[in-house]
Curated annotation (Swiss-Prot):
Signal peptide: none annotated. It is found in: Cytoplasm. Homodimer. Its main location: cytoplasm. This is Protein GrpE. The lineage of its organism: Bacteria, Pseudomonadati, Pseudomonadota, Betaproteobacteria, Burkholderiales. Keywords: Chaperone, Cytoplasm, Stress response. It comes from the Bacteria. Belongs to the GrpE family. The gene is grpE. InterPro entries: GrpE, GrpE_coiled_coil, GrpE_head. It comes from Verminephrobacter eiseniae (strain EF01-2). It holds the Pfam family GrpE.
Length: 181
């Protein structure tokens, strides 16, 4: 045969295949290691963000609790301070040794007006239903039921005023209610 005949490409040697596979495996390993490092960094960043957010939420909760505690403390303080003039009026009345019944009555009326005004400024309002008002179990407490000319289940008389604070009942009004005919 002659040397000029076309040669067929020969299959790569096993060493070359092995070297190519090793190079490819090394490239793939390097790529995966890089991806792993990137994912670990992202995971660490997210874990850090989570811990910071958790700490911030805890701090916000503590601040809110502190604010509520302060609001209660200073709300009560403000209410108590508004009652001091009423206490002063009672002290002044008791200091008078020679008061007439008329003077005592006038002083008690003035002190009651002062107390009522103070309560109203602090959103404490009286529940004092007029006779004939429909009985409301949310604001009234029936002490007795009596026969009356009025429609059934209406207030006949108020035995003791009730009180609400900002629409929440502190004490229901004690009332007598008309019986059904």
């Amino acid at each position: 045969m002659s040397d000029n005949s076309p040669t067929t490409p020969s299959a790569p040697a096993p060493e070359e295949v092995e070297a190519a596979m090793a190079a490819h495996a090394d490239d793939e390993l390097a790529r995966l290691q890089g991806e792993l490092a990137e994912l670990k960094a992202k995971s660490a960043e997210l874990a850090d963000q989570f811990l910071r957010a958790k700490a911030e939420a805890e701090n916000a909760r503590r601040r809110a609790e502190d604010e509520v505690a302060k609001a209660r403390k200073f709300g009560i303080e403000s209410f108590a301070e508004s009652l001091l003039p009423v206490a002063d009026s009672l002290d002044a009345a008791l200091a008078i040794k020679e008061a007439t019944p008329q003077q005592l009555r006038e002083g008690a009326d003035a002190t009651l007006r002062q107390l009522t005004s103070t309560l109203e400024r602090n959103k404490v309002l009286a529940i004092n239903p007029a006779a004939g008002t429909k009985f409301d179990p949310h604001q009234h407490q029936a002490i007795s039921v009596v026969p009356a000319e009025q429609e059934a289940n209406t207030v006949v008389a108020v035995l003791q005023k009730g009180y609400v604070i900002a629409e929440r009942v502190l004490r229901p009004a004690l009332v007598t209610v008309s019986a059904s005919k």
